[in-house]
Amino acid sequence: MAAEGLPERTCAVELDLSALLEREAPAVVAQPISGYPAATQDVALVVDGSVTAAQLLETVRRGAGELLESADVFDVYAGTGIPEGKKSVAIALRFRAPDRTLTADEASQAREAAVAAARDAHGAEIRS
């Protein structure tokens, strides 16, 4: 390397990009933007410490039904006020119908269905 005037710690790489350029890009599928507002409700569920937030989130998503647009964990807490061996997982639920504005009752029913699924699958209780 010294004969070429290059530092001792030099490397060279050759990339053949033709394989990448020849591949067809996957189609991007976008959801249409709704003209109706979302209804957001939060829920904090107390579960056994062995239940992961991902497991609980998946159960909540399945239980909430077709009106659920998104569900995101925004807090996991174990400490004062939570029984030993348990934790509280707080989840933001966003509901939306593609063809109408949801009523508060519809959003609450979907939330309750999500909570019921978590209760059945993980013994979850609403944090008071």
Language model: regions and residue ranges:
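A carboxyl-terminal module marker
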Residues: M1-S128
